UniProtKB/Swiss-Prot annotation:
It comes from Chilobrachys guangxiensis (Chinese earth tiger tarantula). Disulfide bonds join 49-63, 56-68, 62-76. Its main location: secreted. Residues 1-21 form the signal peptide. This is U21-theraphotoxin-Cg1c. It holds the Pfam family Toxin_12. The keyword Protease does not apply. The presence of a 'disulfide through disulfide knot' structurally defines this protein as a knottin. Probable ion channel inhibitor. One of its GO terms (molecular function) is toxin activity.
Amino acid sequence: MKVSVLITLAVLGVMFLLTSAEERGSDQMDSPAWLKSMERIFQSEERECRWLFGGCEKDSDCCEHLGCRRTKPSWCGWDFTFGK
């Protein structure tokens, strides 16, 4: 429920920004460039290691405190260690 409210507010905010830009008389070429720059926020980052339940081939593929579980399909699972 909270997530859907936040998504709705984000969409309304973007719509407000786009309509206010049109009212100020900016040309249509500005809006697509602005939207392309905003794409970076929503793209996932490339990571060096795999998170919990991510696919793996060996233990070094997984993040710290995770080990590769070799059941089919292979996935990264907690190796029962703690620390920083």
